[in-house]
Amino acid sequence: MDERIRAAALEYHRTPKPGKIAVTPTKALTNQADLSLAYSPGVAAACDEIVRDPATAALYTSRANLVAVITNGTAVLGLGNIGPLAGKPVMEGKGVLFKIFADIDVYDLNIRQLDPDKVIELSLIHISRSLAST
């Protein structure tokens, strides 16, 4: 890689705030009333509705617009087996593409697990209920 591009890429990833993605609230939280609706006791109303009808999770949570970009770092975008932590910038980059081009929110998950069956189990069985279309 050209040294100028390398330096510019490192600066891009480092400043003004490290990384390329962030979690931002979709609701106001500016006073005690907002806090009571967002958390306790108001959040219980949304929980009760989801218990009554799980399909309402799409109405009361961000789940319908949330996906995960998951890697264990063994085959990262032309870089090979670089591990989950070194693969994080690539996963964040994929998250940016989802957000900018499709307005889909993304969590990047970088898993320290080499067994593909366990990665799939974690992804599809243990965390998938937090994500869209599961």
Where are these regions (language model features)?
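Ser/Thr/Pro-rich, acidic low-complexity intrinsically disordered regulatory segments
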Residues: 2-11
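An N-cap/entry alpha-helix motif that binds or orients negatively charged groups
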Residues: 15-59
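Gly-rich Lys/Arg/Thr-decorated short loops/hinges at beta-loop-alpha junctions or inter-strand turns
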Residues: 30-31, 71-81, 98-109
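Solvent-exposed alpha-helices and their adjacent loops that cap or buttress functional pockets
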Residues: 57-63, 68-70, 99-100
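Glycine- and acidic-residue-enriched helix-capping/strand-helix junction motifs
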Residues: 77-91
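Short beta->alpha junction loops
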Residues: 109-116
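N-terminal small/polar loop signature for handling phosphorylated ligands or for N-terminal nucleophile
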Residues: 118-124
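Conserved small/polar residues in nucleotide/adenosyl-binding loops
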Residues: 125-132
